[in-house]
Design a protein with these regions (language model features):
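Residues lining hydrophobic/aromatic ligand-binding pockets adjacent to catalytic sites
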Residues: 1-223
Length: 223
């Protein structure tokens, strides 16, 4: 949904075609975050949120991913957007400029129960992100493991050993789980080369039963 807001009929078809218990995580369209930069976006935002509600109980968090060129000088646009954010939806905001990580911004997010997206990537140091995991700004948490390896092109196997990072984040998640009701985690292939393997590593480290890939059917298409 980052590239365009789906039609309501499309979203309803997702509900019908996915199994019970399936949870969707959406991303606010780039038209709002990157083109309009949150300014004058009331109509587009309200349309997107209304369509997201079509998912009903299958709707998980909505990510508002801002680009690295969205800088603290644009705080008024952020404040206005946050003031309009619907309280019935779980919304996480991702900053890729370190200047946004301030006590004031964290307090603003907390006031509106918006999660600061915790991202292990190349924009903000991992050490800082891990420390922020101990200071959740909402009653849920949103974590993305992106990785810095944008040159990886083979996604069929693990190519980077991330066991130390998995251990560090697992410790943070165990502590975080005592402070929030839900933790949503998403792994990109650029993190280790093969995101399903990384997800299984996290499951094992956190005492969960890893999903056996041999038991999975062919991945469905939503389009």
């Amino acid at each position: 949904t980052f590239y365009a807001s789906p039609a309501a009929t499309t979203i309803r078809s997702w509900v019908e075609r996915t199994p019970k218990g399936f949870i969707f995580s959406l991303k606010l369209p780039q038209e709002i975050t990157h083109e309009q930069r949150l300014r004058d976006s009331t109509g587009a935002s309200e349309t997107f949120f209304e369509r997201a509600r079509e998912l009903g109980g299958k709707l998980g968090p909505i990510l508002v991913q801002m680009g690295p060129d969205f800088q603290p000088g644009e705080l008024p646009a952020l404040v206005d957007f946050i003031g309009r954010a619907p309280s019935d939806l779980r919304i996480a905001i991702e900053f890729r400029h370190r200047g946004w990580i301030t006590d004031g911004v964290l307090a603003l997010l907390s006031e509106h129960n918006l999660a600061l997206a915790l991202v292990d990537g190349r924009w903000i140091p991992r050490k800082l992100m891990l420390s922020l995991a101990a200071r959740p700004t909402a009653d849920f948490a949103y974590i993305r493991w992106m990785g810095p390896n944008r040159d990886l092109v083979d996604y069929s196997r693990v190519q980077v050993d991330r066991s130390r990072e998995v251990d560090a984040w697992s410790d943070a998640i165990e502590e975080l789980s005592e402070k929030v009701s839900h933790i949503y985690g998403y792994v990109a292939n650029h993190f280790s080369g093969h995101s399903p393997s990384t997800a299984r590593d996290f499951q094992s480290r956190l005492g969960q039963t890893p999903v056996d890939p041999d038991l999975l059917g062919e991945q469905m298409s939503l389009f």
